[in-house]
Amino acid sequence: MLRSKRWVRRAAGMIVALAGAGSVQAAMTENLATSVTAMSLGNAVTADPPGIESIHFNPAGLARLEGKQKYDSFFAARFRAWAEFSKPEGFSIGGWTDDPVAGTKTGNFGQTLYVPFRGVPGSSFPVLVGAGLGFSYKPDNSPFTFATATYLPQAVGFERTDADDPARFDGRMAVIQRLVYLSPSVGYKVNDQLSVGIAVPIAHQGFALDTDMRTPNDFLGIVGKLQQGFCPEDGGNPIDMFLFGLCSGGKEGRLNPFKKAARMQIDASAAVDLTMNAGVLWEPYDWISLGGVYRGGSDAVLRGTYRFDTEPMLREFSAG
């Protein structure tokens, strides 16, 4: 009878926990290389944080550690993205229907990264490898545990190696990377059941983008069709003065919503960006633990270079 009541209490506790669960948001760039241990568990470790990696997932878990400890991790990653493009029935952009991207597939794909204070390397890699390192120390008979670690809470980097890849308009190269190089942290054991902790990760934030751009909108398409109807191939039109210089840009100034319009390149970073993690861990029994963590958002101000090159199509049309 006692065992039956115990299982009823456990089931009731699980129902209450599930009923109170809310929706969450996730991003494909986060927690992919933070912890090998947590990744193998789907990062569902808030109530059972893994050792020194508790710095990120729940700093209260540091109070579980004893004496001096060291943490090493190693990982290899290969990011792949594949797409095939098609156009729906009745597709038209201002009268243009033959999109050269339709019916094509993405090409070769490489990995890249952001090297702090250097930027993105000149070439991509088939696989990226990385490592993590952490230390913790708990004095004898002390409720405090001190720790620090190096890890990647946010990382994704790819480069399309085919110059004519149809997905180049969605990013020829892109890197979003956050490297925590120092994370002073402390866990405090309130009693045998309750622990709290706080961490202050200090990170380098990097962002790089290289993308081709086109402007498939109806206005551009309609103007391009007007040019086809009024502008001869070898020169202007005598009535062009009434058409607001529609033909003055010459052959290169002919608008096409499917042609490359520009190329944008961004390389920016923040060398020092601080955030905060605060957590609590309650372990009333050896078979259950409840954890909560708050991660302060980053308001990093990135500084770097920005370049925007327009193609002759837009330049000549504007000049005309």
Model-derived features: positions:
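Bacterial N-terminal signal peptides that target proteins for export
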Residues: 2-12
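Bacterial N-terminal signal peptides
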Residues: 10-22
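N-terminal, post-signal peptide beta-strand-biased segments of exported outer-membrane/organellar beta-barrel
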Residues: 22-152
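Outer-membrane beta-barrel porins/channels
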Residues: 25-42, 50, 101, 106, ...
